[in-house]
Structure formats: C-alpha cells, structure tokens
Amino acid sequence: MIQHTNVTGPMMVTQAFLPLLEKSDHPKVINISSGLGSCSASPRFSTTGYQCSKAALNMLTKCFADEKKNVTFVAIHPGWVQTDMGKSKNRDPPVTVSDSAKGILDVANSISDDKSGGFYSFEGKVLPY
C-alpha cells in the first residue's frame, strides 16, 4: 500500500500531466520525499516500508530527470515536521508546517534546470541519495 502512495501514485500523476507540463515555459515536478529515503545518510528506524518507498521515489525523480530533459524534477525532504505523523514519544519535531511549506516553495521556485534530478532539503541543501 505504501509503495502505491509514495511511488506508483506520483509516477502515474506525473505521466498523466507530462503532456501539459511540457507545454509550459518552466515545467517542474516537485516530489515530496524524506530524509529517511536516503540510502547513504538515513538513520535506521522501524519504518522499513516507508524508507524504501521514499528511496524509490528518489530514484523515480532521477529517472524522470534523465528521460525528460525539458522538465525539471526534484525530490525535497520537508524536514521533521510538526504533524501527527511526525510526532515522537521522545521529542517534538523542530519544523513547523508553515516553515516547511515556505521552504519547499522557495526551493521549487528557485531551482534551476541544471539541478534536475537532485534531492534537496526544504532549506535548499543538497542531500545524498
């Protein structure tokens, strides 16, 4: 189920909208990933399915970027956000929903075409795959 939500869904939506996106001046696809989807820098939690699905979303982002040079594709980690999903027994998430959303929009609006296929934090930092 989680693979359908985090990988298959974004792939199908992207494929459906690509013909329209390719007609726009500066088309971009922004995939909301997670730092937990980094194969090289992710801490290990008991969220294997989630982590694997976000790693797959990152790969999907890279594959689309390689295939569609006229569209900018990036994956963005929204941070550890103060949401129901982000709650922890030990401490509160440090990032507010509004700060995360603003950061994602800032990155999306400022990302250049040559950065297509990249993985970024909501603060604009390059993250390792």
Residue ranges and their predicted role:
Residues 1-12, 18-69:
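Catalytic loop of short-chain dehydrogenase/reductase
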Residues 71, 75-83, 87-129:
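C-terminal helical subdomain
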